[in-house]
């Protein structure tokens, strides 16, 4: 019927492989926010789903967003440690050295004089991520329902793996644990320097 012919035509449409289509998708994902930027990076590894040229375009997707304000940083630190920034740090750079989709990093100096880099999650990132994941699952199920040929690509499984990966990234304790293990494994290697983590409380 007409509907099935439209489905077949869409799945064969070479626009799915156009680099320009990938660039438009990249801009769209940036507009949608942090979760979708991360998802775009995942899609960049799945040329079997979006096409080689589009995947190549998405590799240019930068995990880089405007930073959130220093007042928000202060509020987060006070909420997490029950004290203001000034009681933990003798110096704290107001402008982050890097701002990505999930967190941003500030250079700072502890009261004791140790120079550190402080990684802070974006405000409400957990809630935003949970909301966006629900939308991605809905879109994946919609794709599988109305475009049966995509089922072999397992869109819902792609979203599931993506969800679990980002959940790990949102838990900075996992990152600290992995870095500590790496430092321990290379403790006897003079040519390797691993980042050490300082627990404030």
Language-model features, listed with the residues they occupy:
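Broad phosphate/nucleotide-binding scaffolds in NTP-utilizing and phosphate-metabolizing enzymes
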Residues: 1-200
């Amino acid at each position: 019927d007409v509907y099935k012919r439209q489905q077949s035509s869409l799945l064969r449409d070479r626009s799915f492989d156009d680099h320009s289509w990938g660039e438009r998708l990249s801009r769209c994902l940036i507009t949608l926010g942090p979760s979708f930027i991360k998802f775009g990076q995942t899609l960049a590894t799945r040329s079997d789903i979006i096409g080689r040229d589009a995947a190549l375009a998405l590799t240019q997707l930068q995990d880089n967003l405007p930073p959130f304000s220093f007042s928000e940083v202060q509020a987060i630190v006070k909420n997490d440690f029950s004290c203001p920034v000034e009681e933990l740090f003798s110096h704290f750079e107001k402008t982050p050295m890097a701002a990505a989709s999930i967190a941003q990093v500030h250079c700072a100096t502890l009261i004791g004089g140790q120079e550190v880099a402080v990684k802070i999650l974006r405000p409400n990132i957990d809630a935003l991520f949970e909301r966006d994941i629900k939308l991605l699952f809905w879109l994946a199920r919609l794709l599988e329902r109305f475009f049966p040929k995509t089922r072999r690509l397992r869109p819902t499984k792609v979203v599931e793996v993506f969800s679990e990966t980002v959940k790990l990234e949102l838990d900075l304790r996992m990152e600290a644990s992995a870095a500590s293990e790496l430092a321990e494994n290379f403790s006897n290697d003079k040519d390797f320097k691993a980042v050490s983590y300082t627990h404030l409380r």
